[in-house]
Amino acid sequence: MAIFTGAGVAIVTPFKEDETIDYERLDELIDFHCENGTDSIVICGTSGEAATMTECEHMECVKFTVERTKGRIPVIAGTGSNCTKTAMELSKEAADYGVDGVLMVTPYYNKATQKGMIAHFTQVADAAKVPVVLYNIPGRTGCRMDAETVAHLVNHVDNIVAIKEASGDFSNIAKMMELTDGKLDLYSGNDDQIVPLMSLGGKGVISVLSNVAPKAAHDICQLYLDGKVKESLDLQLKALPLIHALFLEVNPIPVKKAVELMGLCGGTLRAPLTELEPEHTEILRREMHHFGLIK
């Protein structure tokens, strides 16, 4: 059974002005998502600025999220690293805290071979024990998981069960689905490609959009799963201007501004990320207004 179906939020991490984690606002965000249609919380991923967290902060954030979610919706922890040993340690600790799964990005910078990725993910999955969601995002990592690599892992490692696909390579994704024969749960990693990915057998999305429009992201997925493909596509297309505004600069710069504009939490970013440019802020504000998120 899938860890979740629908829209999981790639949740932002609220920081105070001094850049410490704002756990009070994170608690409020967790309640917001549990009450507004989000199907899963994915903590400490790209949108959560995990790359600029210490390992101690990372694990404290995971532990807090599991405790505060209280089983209302599944929690998936980003525990990826380009160091296999570190990824193993983070994944095991997250599993000990009670996460429902871990999200594991391909080893970045090292540019591992396909053989190296198989070794990496096999070792990490063995340490984690909980379900593993692979994360293919070559635009950030510098390496791509081939369909055959994904199929080998899914077919040989019992707890590697899903993939977040942000490559945009639909031919490779289709091949993955063919080679795994129903054993791979596919999630879109791109909000503007939810419906296309679901047409290949996808279960939903791990979403930036969900940070500000959780019901819309959920509805795009659920309508498709209910066989209402036209309605799903219509909502996907309606959301495109907002989605594009959320990616005017590198994620999570725009979405951090968006949650600030909605009053959900502060927009503080950790360096080297910098505040959204004023002209982009105005575009974002306009699209949020058009979508009914702010006045």
PLM region spans:
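A general structural signal for well-ordered alpha-helical segments in protein cores
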Residues: L26, H58, V62, A87, ...
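C-terminal alpha-helical cap/extension of soluble enzyme domains
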Residues: G6-P14, N36-T38, S199-L200, I206-K295
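Active-site beta->alpha loop and helix N-cap motifs at the rims of alpha/beta catalytic domains
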Residues: A2-V9, T13-G142, H152, I294
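Short, amphipathic alpha-helical "lid/cap" segments that border enzyme active or binding sites
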Residues: Y23, D27-I30, A147, T281-M288
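Glycine-rich phosphate-binding "P-loop"
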Residues: N136-I137, N159-I160, R270-A271
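Catalytic alpha/beta core domains of metabolic enzymes, predominantly
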Residues: D126-A127, R140-F247
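Secondary-structure boundary/capping positions in well-ordered alpha/beta enzyme cores
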Residues: R72-I73, P131, I160, K183, ...
